[in-house]
Amino acid sequence: MHNLLADRHLDRGAKLLAGALSYLRPELRHPERIPQGGVLLVGNHALMGIDSFALYPLLWRHTQRLPRGLADRFLFKVPGLHKVFHSVGAIEGHPDQAVDLLRQGEMCLVYPGGSAESFKSPAQRYQLFWKDRLGFAKVALRAQVPVVPIMAAGVDHAYRYLFRDKLLVRHVAGQGKARYDFPVSLGLGILPLPVQFTYHVGEPIQPPQGAHLADDPRAVEAFQGLVWRAAQGQLDEAVRQWQAQPRDWLDALGRKLAG
């Protein structure tokens, strides 16, 4: 098994991210629920994937393991961003590579909603865009590893939404045709507003036994639906707790600016 902790470059990347985003006061609740060995973490995405940059250092700190993030290929086309992803062990998402890593006992992290989920409007905050997103379920079934939802509250208030634009996506990613309308938003430059990020780790969800079930559409849809429902319910509860928790002046300011 590849030992991420032995790679000083990855270790340094996690520490740099932790320092840069420390003002968000990110918190990881119930990290003890993450089992040893191969495990597929699934999360909810925020604008520019800023939630994952804060989560990586937390996972490293609490588990002494860095997840292999399975990122949208589109993001690796953004100048400079691919270097940040590689610095913390993230790779372009590919099912075969993910299955191999999980079978080797790695902890992988994927956002089933992908870029579409991270480009949502304020009216769509904390909604999982997982319809027809079956890839993570197939991977978990093939590798026969548990799926653990990690739902983040606060992340959809990290920027103030202004308007949507397709030209920016084509300019940044070099695409002839934009896949998404990019939400032009306001933060602290490219950094998020100072709202606290709170990550809630759910209970592991075991796939039904039999790697062959990854080739059964009904089995894949059933398992995907099971995880999706559990994750959305967990996210709803995480947001309720986040909204009710006491706010310091910095968090209150960030929420007000986010609108």
Task: Show which residues each predicted segment covers.
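Non-catalytic C-terminal accessory region of glycerolipid acyltransferases
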Residues: M1-H9, D100-G259
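Membrane-anchoring hydrophobic helices of lipid-metabolizing enzymes
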Residues: M1-L58, T63-D96, R164-D165, D236-G259
